[in-house]
């Protein structure tokens, strides 16, 4: 199933189930009416405490009454405990950067305040001069996880979504670390919804594309990951407890602006569209804003 947070025409926030084709929605109140299940108000309780599994038993009789285009899609998981990101976790991206891939995850954390809606503007401070894009598969952790073996690591996954790891390269290179240049407010658009893990038979075989103003910039596959998702989860769980709602963004493939001979960094008004097979599409306009 696909689960989303939405805002309707009455400016009311709730959550919904998305139809298989990604075109229609069923709101929380409608789910309750059609199934008779007293589902909770909070999306985290709905997805992490077993209520979604109850609803799945009624999937065949659900009737989707509204179009996705009639609502605003919001950040799927509000206030995640942490956002863990991987650097240089694709062979093609590491090669373009002239680096040898690491056997262990190279990680950094993004602040929750960087999260952004899947179709909302990315607001870039005017002092940023080299703004870059990074399409990534994000994993949503579904249960508390500590020291999980690799062969059981995917049991901890609730689902997957797209995350755009927007990056201010000038700040990143100046600081010689990732957090400030990747942690600016709105620099993590994500969604458009969470696709539950049962719909993704092989997360290591998903096609990934990024287009800027219609021009394809990234065109790769998660099969190019250096460290696969199951090993990422296992490795992280050795040093930190993973919690329900944690987001793990698994790195980006080749094609980013900084690796070009003549870098095409993002400019004011550019539109970045990221599509990942089975996960959907997010689209964001770049808006430079003075301090």
What are these regions (language model features)?
Residues 4, 73-75, 95-98, 122-131, ...:
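A generic local secondary-structure boundary/capping motif
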Residues 10, 93, 99, 169-291:
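Catalytic-pocket segment enriched in acidic/His residues
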Residues 78, 132-134, 243, 267-268:
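Residue-level recognition of short, solvent-exposed, well-ordered loop/turn junctions
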Residues 101-118, 133, 267-278:
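Structural signature of FAD isoalloxazine-binding scaffolds in flavoprotein oxidoreductases
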Residues 141-163:
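RNA pseudouridine synthases
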């Amino acid at each position: 199933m696909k689960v989303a947070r939405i805002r309707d025409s009455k400016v009311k926030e709730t959550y919904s189930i998305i139809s298989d084709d990604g075109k229609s929605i069923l709101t929380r109140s409608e789910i309750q009416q059609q199934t008779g299940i007293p589902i909770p108000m909070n999306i985290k309780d709905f997805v992490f405490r077993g209520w979604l599994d109850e609803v799945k038993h009624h999937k065949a009789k659900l009737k989707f009454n509204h179009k996705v285009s009639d609502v605003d899609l919001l950040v799927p998981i509000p206030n995640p405990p942490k956002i863990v990101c991987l650097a240089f976790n694709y062979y093609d991206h590491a090669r373009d950067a002239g680096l040898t891939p690491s056997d262990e995850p190279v990680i950094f954390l993004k602040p929750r305040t960087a999260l952004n809606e899947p179709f909302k503007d990315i607001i870039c401070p005017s002092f940023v001069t080299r703004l870059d894009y990074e399409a990534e598969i994000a994993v949503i952790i579904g249960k508390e996880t500590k020291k999980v073996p690799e062969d059981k690591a995917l049991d901890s996954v609730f689902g997957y979504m797209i995350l755009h790891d927007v990056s201010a390269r000038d700040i990143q290179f100046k600081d010689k670390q990732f957090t400030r240049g990747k942690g600016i407010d709105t620099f993590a658009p994500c969604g458009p919804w969470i696709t539950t893990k049962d719909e993704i038979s092989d997360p290591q075989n998903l096609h990934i594309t990024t287009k800027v103003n219609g021009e394809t910039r990234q065109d790769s596959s998660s099969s190019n990951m250096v460290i696969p998702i199951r090993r990422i989860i296992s490795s992280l769980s050795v040093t930190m407890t993973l919690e329900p709602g944690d987001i793990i963004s698994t790195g980006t493939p080749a094609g980013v602006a900084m690796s070009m001979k003549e870098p095409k960094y993002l400019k004011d008004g550019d539109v970045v569209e990221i599509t990942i097979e089975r996960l959907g599409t997010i689209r964001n306009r770049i808006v430079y804003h003075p301090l």
